[in-house]
Regions:
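Short Lys/Arg-rich cationic patches that frequently serve as NLS/NoLS or arginine-rich RNA/DNA-binding motifs
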Residues: 1-8, 12, 148, 152-155
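Metalloprotease/metallohydrolase-associated module, dominated by Zn2+-dependent proteases
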Residues: 102-172
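Active-site scaffold of zinc-dependent metalloenzymes
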Residues: 26-73, 82-89
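N-terminal low-structure segments adjacent to metalloprotease catalytic domains
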Residues: 3-4, 87, 97, 123, ...
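Short secondary-structure junctions
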Residues: 18-26
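Conserved, surface-exposed functional patches that form binding/active-site neighborhoods
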Residues: 85-113
Length: 172
């Protein structure tokens, strides 16, 4: 397996692009998350069907088309993860713990899903969990209210990802 090159530069460029939002740490990972203990936004460059479903969920739930302000699903996902940080104090411990339990059940259901349609329904349950929905709502509202900032972030992030892909020989 070839070594991945330029990860530090990519993380640094994304961190710089997200500086207006107070993001201190970013890390390329295999999964998306916001790590509250280390105040780290973890992101993935893996594209999958879930991205399409997330777009559809945003459109159907918030009447927002990803791309309206020039952002792509990657940036709206970044904003979603930041949204977890921004909305965590609005969720009671009881509700948050219930969300964690439901996420475990959802993961088991996804692992056992037999069809794409079944997996989509399960993912929608995940998207609708209180903590996930609030983070997405925050992301959408931020994108709506800060169009110029979002366009600037999108440009910087897209350029950094393109350079990373080029350095690693990734093509469309």
């Amino acid at each position: 397996m070839a070594k991945v090159k330029g990860t530090k530069k990519l993380n640094k460029a994304i961190k710089k692009a997200l500086a207006p939002l107070g993001v201190e740490n970013v890390k390329l990972d295999t999964e998306w998350s916001y790590d509250f203990e280390t105040d780290t936004l973890r992101y993935s460059l893996t594209e999958c069907i879930t991205d399409i479903w997330f777009n559809e969920y945003i459109r159907d739930t918030f009447r927002y088309i990803v791309g309206n302000t020039g952002e792509d699903v990657f940036l709206i996902s970044v904003l979603h993860e930041i949204g977890h940080r921004e909305t965590i104090d609005f969720i009671s411990d009881k509700v948050y713990n219930k969300c964690l339990i439901e996420k475990g059940k959802i993961q088991i259901a996804l692992d056992n899903a037999l069809t794409e349609e079944e997996a989509k329904k399960i993912e929608y349950k995940y998207f609708a969990l209180t903590d996930e929905n609030q983070a997405t709502e925050w992301a959408v509202n931020y994108a709506r209210k800060h169009r110029k900032k979002v366009k600037k972030m999108q440009k910087a992030v897209a350029e950094a990802v393109a350079k990373f892909y080029e350095k690693n020989g990734v093509t469309d």
